[in-house]
């Protein structure tokens, strides 16, 4: 199990690297071999953070189904949903929301995922996230 969770100089495990690069079959193989979903890079990012930031929605869905924390925060306070919003990865945003990610979480600067989407010129992503925030408030 040690080698499946070995880290490179950036703190990337094979699972993080595969999630970042969109290598779905490799991610699946690593998960079957017991790769650690909670392992983080030097920047505090999990494999789900990297899948979300790079728009790899199928990988994000696999990681969530295996129990990855959808609201995990990196060292800057970003969740996978925030990273997907920054890069306008609409399909991944929907996968994260469906997986239980909270659209109303904020960074220490009080920035939500919807604000990141808006600030980075991703109006559809911003609209999706604002709608999800409203839905959460009505069910809370």
Where are these regions (language model features)?
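Conserved ankyrin/ankyrin-like repeat signature
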Residues: 25-26, 58-59, 91-92, 124-125
């Amino acid at each position: 199990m040690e080698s499946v969770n070995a880290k490179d100089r950036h703190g990337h495990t094979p699972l993080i690297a595969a999630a970042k690069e969109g290598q779905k079959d490799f991610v699946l193989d690593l998960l079957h071999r017991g790769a650690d979903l909670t392992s983080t890079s030097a920047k505090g990012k999990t494999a789900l953070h990297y899948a979300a930031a790079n728009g790899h929605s199928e990988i994000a869905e696999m990681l969530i189904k295996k129990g990855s924390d959808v609201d995990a925060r990196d060292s800057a306070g970003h969740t996978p949903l925030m990273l997907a919003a920054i890069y306008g990865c609409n399909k991944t945003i929907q996968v994260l929301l469906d997986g239980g990610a909270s659209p109303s979480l904020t960074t220490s600067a009080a920035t939500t995922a919807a604000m990141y989407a808006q600030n980075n010129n991703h109006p559809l992503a911003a609209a999706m996230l604002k709608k999800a925030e409203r839905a959460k408030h009505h069910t809370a």
